[in-house]
Amino acid sequence: MTLLVTGSSGFLGRRAAAYLASLGHTVLTPSHSQLDITRESSVRVWFAEHRPDAVIHCAAISDTGICQREPERSHVVNVEGPVLLAKACRETGAKLVFCSSDQVYFGSPYPGPHCEEEPLSPGNVYGRQKLLAEQQCAALCPDTVSLRLSWMYDDQSLPGEHGHFLTTLLSALRDPAQPLSWPVHDFRGMTHVGEVVRNLPAALSLPGGVYNFGAENDRDTFHTVRALLERLHLQEPLSRLTPNQEAFAQNPRDIRMDASTLHAAGITFRTTLQGLTETLGNLL
């Protein structure tokens, strides 16, 4: 297959492009100057020339703080860009896989784990933009597969990347002077990016719809870390671990996802604790 991967310089996109190419696919990773997803003329010209069989749309402004401060600019990238790609996919017959986010569940009045059919009213700009993009892409191109991704980590950091949960935890584990404090009012899944990437080929075959696409978790972040340290018998860090009672205390965050729909389609992920235990255990 000829695949377009947008956001190929980002955390997910660069790994997705490399993995899909290793499977023998022709993977196209145009630069912004070659394909500006926010300009309809650029999208039309590029698709007319290259005609990919499928699009894996990873590009986004994913920093929730930037989205809050600059909602107009982030709307152009996070909503208008996917819409233009959906139009192009409809016109050329390409399959669209849209990378959405568990942030669509932020502010939900329902406790997690959340299922895809829940009525949603995201409590932050980024979540609202992702949900709107899901809806508009589905309306334009009903075969669109929207993947609601969780917080991702890797066992290595590539040049130019910011830190993630695992790098932050590793830094604290290696420095006894660093505090180890994690929130008790924050519930979310964490997924190894390698699992996401390895499941993308199967996602290309999913029928159009929305899918929770990541690791399940039945603990808050503090108790996830505590269980992880206990499983790995890391007694010294355990003695430093304290619960953060202030973060999210006024507005607890529960964006955990129920992956039953995905499991029924034959796609599975390790649980958050399983993935972190295996990954961190291999790094220590």
What are these regions (language model features)?
Residues 83-121:
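Conserved Rossmann-fold NAD(P)-dependent oxidoreductase catalytic core, especially the SDR/UDP-sugar
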Residues 40-77, 88:
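NAD(P)H-binding glycine-rich loop region in Rossmannoid oxidoreductase-like domains
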